[in-house]
Regions:
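Thiamine diphosphate
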Residues: 1-173
Length: 173
């Protein structure tokens, strides 16, 4: 299950209560999970078979992208970093943390091999854009406008960091 801004974990809890013999995987951004951290206690108290995967980029990524495509520089979307592994462990929930993409496969195998709740904190690039399946001309114009505003507002370093993070992911012939 995947949910933006706080619905992945409640859906996963419902699915786990419906069938306790099935492993449920909840994919959540750090912003959405932080809105419902108390539900981790529900997982623990009921020993629900839910693996919570947190995409931890220390930003409200979708909110940021929505602002950028509307021509506004992102404002108040970055958050202080949180170590969700330590947070889960403080609740006696087994947890793992991935900071290197090469560790993903083995970490997920470890997580899925456990019974009961487990949290996987996947640290991701805060500048990596979540690209929608289709992009309109208006979104391109809005994004270009917001980047221009950022540059003229003294944020050229941020624009360059975003460009570097995203250009490396474009396939080359």
């Amino acid at each position: 299950l995947h949910g933006s801004m706080a619905n992945a974990l409640p859906h996963a809890i419902g699915a786990a209560f419906a069938d306790r013999d099935r492993q449920v995987v909840a994919l959540a951004g750090d912003g959405g999970l932080s809105m419902l951290l108390g539900e981790l206690i529900t997982l623990r108290d009921h020993e629900l078979p839910v693996t919570v995967v947190v995409f931890n980029n220390a930003t409200l990524g979708m909110v940021k992208l929505e602002m950028l495509v509307e021509g506004m520089p992102a404002h108040a979307t970055d958050t202080p970093p949180v170590d969700y592994r330590r947070l889960a462990e403080s609740l006696d929930i087994p947890a793992l943390r991935v900071q290197d993409p090469r560790e993903l496969r083995s970490t997920f195998a470890d997580a899925l091999g456990r019974r009961g709740p487990v949290l996987v904190d996947v640290v991701t690039d805060p500048n990596a854009l979540s690209i929608p399946p289709s992009i309109t001309a208006g979104q391109v114009r809005g994004f270009a406008t917001s980047m221009t505003k950022q540059i003229f507002g003294g944020g050229s370093g941020e624009v360059m960091a975003m460009a570097r993070s995203n250009l490396r992911n474009i396939p080359r012939p």
